[in-house]
Amino acid sequence: PRITIQIEPREPGAAPYPDPNRVPDVTAEPERPLEPDSAAAWFWSVVSPQIGVPGRYDQAIAHLSEAPQTRDLRLPRFEDLTAIVQAHGREILASTAGSDVSAAFVLAVIAVESAGRVEVVSHAGAQGLMQLIPATAERFGVGDPFDPGQNIAGGAAYLSWLMENFNGDPVLALAGYNAGEGAVARAGGVPNYDETRDYVPKVLATWLMARQLCTRRPDLVSDPCLFTTLVSG
């Protein structure tokens, strides 16, 4: 049968899409102090945090799928992922349509960043579903970070930029999303911050769950995903 997806158009007055010709300032992210080894040291003992490691994504996914420690990452529940899709799935699809970032990957980031809470603000000032700091929101054309459509569009655009900037490496892209791309560049890989070293495997493990909500399971974070609950026909 023919598959159709109903995606609502962007409302008049919404923040514009980011200018692809604008080069973000990689020094804009704040410095964070170096921290001791994270609770996810078991993950990094197998997966190299350094820049330029081929095959890292496959290695990370295999390790997360097999290691018993994965269950200790305090992952979102599958029911939470489903609820986010029901509430914001159309905005996620609209923001990832035609991009190199899977809707399931964006879903995983939302689940870890905010648990689907639209108006949450972190202690560091990150805002909304994808926890955009004000400077990042401005970079990617987000006028109202508490508007779900704008926030998701900005976060998805930032993920896409990070994937391109780090040559399609999801591990470095996630590290950049959490710590800032400048921190990744300065560290020569995933910075040795507890928060970042825990964040990367947590999002990747959540991605393994999120892709189960797609009509066809994506293998790569760049593969397309249509959420089963939004498919008709």
Language-model segments: which ranges?
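Cell-wall glycan-active module
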Residues: 1-107, 201-233
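Second-shell loop/turn segments in exported
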Residues: 71, 75-83, 92-97, 118-123, ...
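Surface-exposed patches in mature extracellular/periplasmic domains of secreted proteins
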Residues: 100-108, 146, 168-176, 215-216
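Extended amphipathic alpha-helical interaction segments
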Residues: 103, 116-118
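Acidic helix/loop microenvironments that form the catalytic cleft of cell-wall polysaccharide enzymes
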Residues: 110-115, 154-158, 168-194, 199-206, ...
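Substrate-binding/active-site groove segments that recognize
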Residues: 120-143, 154-163, 181-182, 200-203
